[in-house]
């Protein structure tokens, strides 16, 4: 019986799934500085009195390999430095360019909005023609559809497109101002500006000057929406739904507000009460907000190690897998010496197939016999397995 239970334990272990360890984002190493001192040589020759000194050629070869490795590291660092400098210079140049563009007056915004509305009306007619003709219409066909001379039509088209460009370009500083508030959330500053600019273009197309408010007030909502959607869609390896990302943002704001009010870090209960949600839901959302960390993340000053090097592998080794396969084969060989009914009873009783041990009552119902009869069959089968000719095969697996 002891042998069989040990065997069953091995079978259950074989059926268990691997647990995945949730890493705390706090483990994430600090970002690498652009300027770092050059790497020192890793090898230092220590010669003991009894040690034979290597030939000069071999030593030179080793030094050459170290030199090549250091040159490659230096080249990689130089490229990273150039890339960072280029990016910073590009942003600086972009900010200088948009800073030269004059802001619009209220009357100019209204006039541009009218011209943009005329452009959108023309484009709607073009879309209708596209559906009818199943191709892009020519300028002549387009002008005829809007009942306008071709020259006048082209002037209207040019004015509308120029007005849209001017409306967008004159408000690019607004995009930069809003993008700064969303830095360090998973997207680079350039990407935030790009996404915010798309929101600004959408605002220029949807703006209704007859409502009475300024374009910048209206455009702010569209810019924020474009940026937050982009962060939700692109900043994570595992994408979160937009509504969940918005809830995470509200939790962060609430936590910051409570910290200012109380002068300390609020508890989960206090945050959940202010957010009007259960603690279980709050914990689920907080867990969803955690960012995954790559096992290839560099560790240490020299970045010569990876995070995965310090995490214990809890999976089976090849040796364990081979041992379990051999155990399974030997167990099948021993069970094959029993009668079919005895073999089936033991399989069901000790869960040798699916890992679930069934009761005598359950097995009796399957075989349409009493539980006492199943107990007798089980006892007889175990007596056979205790015979030295059978259990000697499995003894080596018992630890």
Swiss-Prot record:
Transmembrane segments: none annotated. GO terms for cellular component: cytoplasm. Residues 167-237 are annotated as: Sigma-70 factor domain-2. PROSITE patterns: SIGMA70_1, SIGMA70_2. Its main location: cytoplasm. Residues 60-73 have a biased composition (Acidic residues). Keywords: Cytoplasm, DNA-binding, Sigma factor, Transcription, Transcription regulation. CDD domains: Sigma70_r4. Residues 1-73 are annotated as: Disordered. GO terms for molecular function: DNA binding; sigma factor activity. Coiled coil: none annotated. GO terms for biological process: DNA-templated transcription initiation. It is found in: Cytoplasm. Interacts transiently with the RNA polymerase catalytic core. Belongs to the sigma-70 factor family. RpoD/SigA subfamily. Sigma factors are initiation factors that promote the attachment of RNA polymerase to specific initiation sites and are then released. This sigma factor is the primary sigma factor during exponential growth. This is RNA polymerase sigma factor SigA1. It comes from Synechococcus elongatus (strain ATCC 33912 / PCC 7942 / FACHB-805). The lineage of its organism: Bacteria, Bacillati, Cyanobacteriota, Cyanophyceae, Synechococcales.
